[in-house]
Amino acid sequence: MSDMTEIPSPLPGTFYQRPEPDAAPYKSKGDDVAVGEVIGLIEVMKTFIEVKAESAGTFESYLAENAAPVQAGAALARLA
């Protein structure tokens, strides 16, 4: 079994797991994730910044709730 990798928040703000309120989350358990693939959004002062995977793997789970405030460096999601 491979090691788990956590995807950190690039900056403080509000984390969103989905591109729009009524849309499905960017990723679900078992989905493949490629380097540079978007897994969420951080909102800072009404600006949305894409959170991208820095490594490839299999999506395990979101570690931050949807629409939750997060700090820079906080783990947002986990890959296997």
Model-derived regions, located:
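Short beta-strand-turn/beta-hairpin segments enriched in glycine/proline and small hydrophobics
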Residues: 2-23, 41-54
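Short hydrophobic beta/alpha edge segments that flank linear recognition/processing sites
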Residues: 28-50, 71-80
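Short histidine-centered loop motifs in beta-beta connectors
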Residues: 17-32, 60-65
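PDZ-domain C-terminal substructure recognizer with occasional recognition of PDZ-binding tails
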Residues: 57, 62-76
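Absolute protein N-terminus
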Residues: 1-2, 80
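Amphipathic alpha-helical interaction segments
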Residues: 23-24, 34, 56, 70
